[in-house]
Regions:
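HIT superfamily nucleotide-processing domains
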Residues: 1-112
């Protein structure tokens, strides 16, 4: 498998790590869309939210318990947005499930 995020998790490609535990890895986005923009990925390869199953759903639940810790460590005390793009029409550029944490300023209310 040739997956960019798997290579980052494995340390084959450098990243600016902000959090890591046994199930997930978070790093700063290389093209930030907000003053603070990081990605949280499961260490296990899951292609997208369409591939979440009974067998791997605990990893996704774990990520959502890690996100508040990551946001706090990034100084996002006034709020943040979590985004996940799914599939081509959803503009998913890397086929490895990931969640964007965006914040650091008042975000536009036009997205959701």
């Amino acid at each position: 498998m040739n997956c960019l995020f798997c290579a980052i998790v494995n340390g084959d490609i450098p990243s600016k790590k902000v959090y890591e535990d046994e199930k997930c890895y978070a790093f700063l986005d290389i093209a930030p869309q907000a003053p603070v923009h990081c990605l949280v990925v499961p260490k296990e390869h899951i292609a997208s939210a369409n591939d979440i199953s009974e067998e791997n759903s605990a990893v996704v639940a774990h990520i959502f318990t890690a996100i508040p810790k990551i946001a706090k460590a990034l100084g996002l005390v006034n709020g943040y947005r979590i985004v996940s793009n799914i599939g081509d029409d959803g503009c998913q550029s890397v086929k490895h499930l990931h969640f964007h944490i965006l914040g650091g300023e008042k975000l536009s209310d036009k997205m959701a």
